[in-house]
């Protein structure tokens, strides 16, 4: 096993740990989930570039008769990238005392101001940061509004 294979195993393990945390652990942290809303995906260009580069590495490894283990590890890395970037749905998860947005816990008392833009983007101003929440279904904005009013 080469150092390349060890690095690939490390990256696959990191992506798998992130996927498990995002899918199973995060919704169970900080109390019961009150509301979980699907968000729009950000640009997919980065994911296409990543999976494309891994596909080029697989092709290069196969044509140069590289180690089969490396080919399998690169394939697993491509599948993990495909899952994380294309199959997994980003979500905002509301709890009793706060919410998870982009895997970061934010308490409700940190929200200083909220606005709704013309194109349906909910803008939350925190102390030093502004969150742009783009929901997949525009009707979910009303659910978020009702939940925030009830918890404030």
From Swiss-Prot:
InterPro entries: DUF986. GO terms for cellular component: plasma membrane. Its main location: membrane. It is found in: Cell inner membrane. Keywords: Cell inner membrane, Cell membrane, Membrane, Transmembrane, Transmembrane helix. The keyword Amino-acid biosynthesis does not apply. It is a multi-pass membrane protein. The chain crosses the membrane at residues 6-26, 45-65, 67-87. It comes from the Bacteria. Disulfide bonds: none annotated. The keyword Membrane applies. Belongs to the UPF0266 family. This is UPF0266 membrane protein YobD. It comes from Salmonella heidelberg (strain SL476).
């Amino acid at each position: 096993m080469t150092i390349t294979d060890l690095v690939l195993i490390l990256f696959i393990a990191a992506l798998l740990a992130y996927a498990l945390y995002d899918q199973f652990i995060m919704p169970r942290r900080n109390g019961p989930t009150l509301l979980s809303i699907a968000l729009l995906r950000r640009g997919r260009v980065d994911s296409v570039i990543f999976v494309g580069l891994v596909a080029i590495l697989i092709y290069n490894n196969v044509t140069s008769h590289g180690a089969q283990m490396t080919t399998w590890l690169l394939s697993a890395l491509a599948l993990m990238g495909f899952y994380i970037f294309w199959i997994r749905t980003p979500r905002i998860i509301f709890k009793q005392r706060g919410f998870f947005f982009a895997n970061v816990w934010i308490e409700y008392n940190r929200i200083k101001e909220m606005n709704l833009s013309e194109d349906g983007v909910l803008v939350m101003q925190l102390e030093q940061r502004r969150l742009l929440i783009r929901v997949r279904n525009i009707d979910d904005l009303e659910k978020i509004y009702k939940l925030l009013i009830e918890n404030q």
